[in-house]
C-alpha cells in the first residue's frame, strides 16, 4: 500500500502541517509507503535551519519521515515564488513539478491533503 500526503500549509501558523507529518510518520511505522508533496506555503516545511523554541519542530518530523523511507518532493514554482532554492531545503527534499505530483497520485492507493 502507498499513500501520498500533500501539505499545502506553512508550519507554525496552523496545525495542518503537523497533523500531516504525524499521519505520514504513523503510516511509515505501520509499513505503508509514503510520498510527501509540499505545495503552496507547504514548501516552508522543508526549509532547513528552522529552530522553533516553543512548538514541535516540523523539520525534525520531516527528516524522520525521510529516514523511514518517505519520498519528499517540493513544488519548484512554489519555491521560486517564495524566494526559495533547492539549497534552502533539507537533504532528501527535491524540487519537483506538477508532473511529479501526478506521478505520485497515479502510483498511490490513497491521497490525503492537509
UniProtKB/Swiss-Prot annotation:
- One cellular-component annotation, GO: cytosol
Which spans of this chain does the record mark as coiled coil? none
Highest taxon, organism lineage: Archaea
| Disulphide bridges | none
Name the Pfam families on file. Answer: DsrE
PANTHER family attached to this UniProt entry: PROTEIN YCHN (PTHR34874:SF1)
Q: Which family does it belong to?
A: To M.kandleri MK0008.
What is the designated name of this protein?
A: Uncharacterized protein MJ0989
